[in-house]
Amino acid sequence: MNTADFDFHLPEELIAQTPLEKRDASKLLIVNRETGEMQDKHFHSIIDMLEPGDALVMNDTRVLPARLYGQKVETGGHVELLLLKNTSGDEWEVLAKPAKRLKVGTRISFGDGRLSAVVTEELTHGGRIVRFEYQGIFLEVLESLGEMPLPPYIHEKLDDRERYQTVYAKESGSAAAPTAGLHFTKELLAEIQAKGVHLVYLTLHVGLGTFRPVSVDNLDEHEMHSEFYQLSEEAAATLRSVKKNGGRVIAVGTTSIRTLETIGSKFDGQIQADSGWTNIFIKPGYEWKVVDAFSTNFHLPKSTLVMLVSAFAGRELVLDAYHHAIQEHYRFFSFGDAMFIY
């Protein structure tokens, strides 16, 4: 299959620039992948799609305020760093601007000097490895100095940075939010749990590769970015029990899907506690191991995420659903509306 097979025209005004006032007031397009039937609902009605004994699996990663503005110690020149991933100890892989002026050994100071960094390695495409030096706890220093790295298609300033976090965000480490989870409120989750649905959490730290367009025509030539994931023994045991008793594993978002399917692929369809790095690329033709249904937002044309959804529901049905959503003025991308596919 070719990348162009997953293209569609999206009017720019449908790209949501800000979150809705109420998280669960967003729209929900429900799609039956067997019959092709579609229903227009509001997100709160996702509870009607869940049955007692099902498991709802969510990614509890927390977005880092990963954009830092600083100065080169020697010259005072302005520097922007975007933290991508923690490689070891106090060393991070970052995207740097202007990269060509940041050679190995360059020192950078941030804010009032509470945080500084030295470049230890040069990578391709503006990438650098830097080692941070600071007083106190790194994440606390970052919270006070860093800015939230919103996706490139969002041009409005975010008034409340917590609106780019899920209400259950806990494990710091992402460069982007697992946006399918942004629709849930604590009240809705309590209602879902009261219905007899198991709430299960895993962690996948979302990398910026999630926004990177596919640059090759042939999907077989596309290389996925790697992201760190973790599933606890308690969560794995709950999911095994749900499957054994005939319940469904329902994933919230593509990051939860990629974690569950990575583990299912690794352990021959079994769900085991595990952690590591995944670069799984789920595209049409993929044989599903774990996930029975999922919710997800509306994704960018020609993105690996549209391909993942198409692997579950079929390319034609997914593109039909997207065209329906466009006609009905659904909001797209990170702050947009959602779909539920079963």
From Swiss-Prot:
<keyword id="KW-0808">Transferase</keyword>
<dbReference type="InterPro" id="IPR042119">
    <property type="entry name" value="QueA_dom2"/>
</dbReference>
<keyword id="KW-0671">Queuosine biosynthesis</keyword>
<keyword id="KW-0949">S-adenosyl-L-methionine</keyword>
<dbReference type="Pfam" id="PF02547">
    <property type="entry name" value="Queuosine_synth"/>
</dbReference>
<dbReference type="InterPro" id="IPR036100">
    <property type="entry name" value="QueA_sf"/>
</dbReference>
<dbReference type="GO" id="GO:0051075">
    <property type="term" value="F:S-adenosylmethionine:tRNA ribosyltransferase-isomerase activity"/>
</dbReference>
<dbReference type="GO" id="GO:0005737">
    <property type="term" value="C:cytoplasm"/>
</dbReference>
<comment type="similarity">
    <text>Belongs to the QueA family.</text>
</comment>
<comment type="function">
    <text>Transfers and isomerizes the ribose moiety from AdoMet to the 7-aminomethyl group of 7-deazaguanine (preQ1-tRNA) to give epoxyqueuosine (oQ-tRNA).</text>
</comment>
<keyword id="KW-0963">Cytoplasm</keyword>
<dbReference type="GO" id="GO:0008616">
    <property type="term" value="P:queuosine biosynthetic process"/>
</dbReference>
<dbReference type="InterPro" id="IPR003699">
    <property type="entry name" value="QueA"/>
</dbReference>
<comment type="subunit">
    <text>Monomer.</text>
</comment>
<dbReference type="InterPro" id="IPR042118">
    <property type="entry name" value="QueA_dom1"/>
</dbReference>
<protein>
    <recommendedName>
        <fullName>S-adenosylmethionine:tRNA ribosyltransferase-isomerase</fullName>
        <ecNumber>2.4.99.17</ecNumber>
    </recommendedName>
</protein>
<comment type="pathway">
    <text>tRNA modification; tRNA-queuosine biosynthesis.</text>
</comment>
<dbReference type="GO" id="GO:0002099">
    <property type="term" value="P:tRNA wobble guanine modification"/>
</dbReference>
